[in-house]
């Protein structure tokens, strides 16, 4: 329900901005129909393809290996833990994978709640207690149960569409104003070089600004996944897991994977551009019960 509400509210906000831009620039809506269709195709196309290929891409990026049959006691424990927590959360058993990395980390991905993947690093299995590891796995199971991957795709698609459409509308106006040779009664599309240059710069700038929205949601869903873990295995286990993460190596996963991992990179120019809240804030949120209500 929340996923649909977020999608509708975001789309409503985008359409309001579209209307304002068209009114302020004097551009007729019929002249931008093709541009809107293109923006939708490009904006959602990349996000949807990424979602559909997310399991394959994630495994390739970290060199993960799916466990088909447990080969040792650790793999058996991991499979049993994921199976038990999946039943508790009311989702189908995800695929389970292990990848080699010294940092303590794990991630969940997949296009659907009932066709997902949970992967953990060897660093997690080697450096966390079973209670702490259970909490991390429960955090990832909560991401799946909450439908976070799909929600992130919808938000990213709307944001992408907004960036493409607004950038090119402004570029069209700028090209017509700066480079058009317009006779009375004739319409000019302006200088194509100016249009291309302005559109490229604006897409870059608006893309950076728009990432604030997606990063905010990424941080928001981390708080809720922490709370989901606390409900599955207990608050103290999740707090202990987060405290253990404070002593971990800086994550080595690719930047494109950070939003899906439990342990995000701590170095950023601003918290606005972080995929994860600071660990201290996550611990405090659990202690206060802010997201457990």
Curated annotation (Swiss-Prot):
Taxonomic superkingdom: Bacteria
Binding residue positions for Zn(2+): 139, 143, 222
UniProtKB keywords: Cell inner membrane, Cell membrane, Hydrolase, Membrane, Metal-binding, Metalloprotease, Protease, Transmembrane, Transmembrane helix, Zinc
Cellular localization per UniProt: Cell inner membrane
EC number: 3.4.24.-
Entry's transmembrane regions: 4-24, 32-52, 158-178, 193-213
Membrane topology: Multi-pass membrane protein
Cofactor(s) it depends on: Zn(2+)
Residues the record marks as active site: 140
Cofactor note: Binds 1 zinc ion per subunit.
Record's keyword annotation contains Transmembrane: yes
Pfam family, one: Peptidase_M48
Cellular component, GO annotation: plasma membrane
GO MF: metalloendopeptidase activity; zinc ion binding
Record-linked InterPro entries: HtpX_protease, Pept_M48_protease_HtpX, Peptidase_M48
GO annotation, biological process: proteolysis
Similarity field: Belongs to the peptidase M48B family.
Protein's UniProt name: Protease HtpX
Species in which this protein is naturally found: Cronobacter sakazakii (strain ATCC BAA-894)
Lineage: Bacteria, Pseudomonadati, Pseudomonadota, Gammaproteobacteria, Enterobacterales
